[in-house]
């Protein structure tokens, strides 16, 4: 199956790219510049495409991102510290982000005669991000069947939608994903901060998967205290 992967450069999507390269015919990686403060993630997506020997396209939607105000990822709002499963993390929502990206990706896939678009949403995203939930994935696939009816039949692959991030780490290890060549931190500094929701979730996932985490964090111990507090 000719598959186009939406790849941010993060652990989830890079692991997905390696999985799709092994299980399908990977036709390319598609990334989006929406004005995210952690834009350096795109360099990791580019490196992934080069490693897998496929084209990499970055689509500039910064003008759209500039209109999606109020998010800590695109606006002048601090990225909070803590675990994803906290109300404070809702400030990292970029409204309709996945819907916008997927609509573009399906158009690109149809134009390129690809059979599928793959997206790395997972179970850990459900609490905060509505456009990562199974209901959204199913509804979007249905909508695209109507949108491309008579022109193309493009499937939406979301193999991790019911999985945990620890499951993704285990799967990534299976497909030899170089985890050190992925970027998660929302703060976009030189090193992973170790304190934002995505850093905490990343560090916890390696721990739960029983796999060594090669990531260099500014605060390598914060995740333990915040996860213990959450589970208390």
From Swiss-Prot:
It is an enzyme of class 6 (ligase). It catalyses: 7-carboxy-7-deazaguanine + NH4(+) + ATP = 7-cyano-7-deazaguanine + ADP + phosphate + H2O + H(+). Disulfide bonds: none annotated. Pathway: Purine metabolism; 7-cyano-7-deazaguanine biosynthesis. Catalyzes the ATP-dependent conversion of 7-carboxy-7-deazaguanine (CDG) to 7-cyano-7-deazaguanine (preQ(0)). Signal peptide: none annotated. It comes from the Bacteria. SUPFAM superfamilies: Adenine nucleotide alpha hydrolases-like. One of its GO terms (biological process) is queuosine biosynthetic process. CDD domains: QueC-like (cd01995). Zn(2+) binds at residues 185, 193, 196, 199. Its EC number is 6.3.4.20. Its cofactor is Zn(2+). InterPro entries: QueC, Rossmann-like_a/b/a_fold. Binds 1 zinc ion per subunit. Keywords: ATP-binding, Ligase, Metal-binding, Nucleotide-binding, Queuosine biosynthesis, Zinc. GO terms for molecular function: ATP binding; ligase activity, forming carbon-nitrogen bonds; zinc ion binding. This is 7-cyano-7-deazaguanine synthase. Pfam families: QueC. It comes from Brucella abortus (strain 2308). Belongs to the QueC family. ATP binds at residues 7-17.
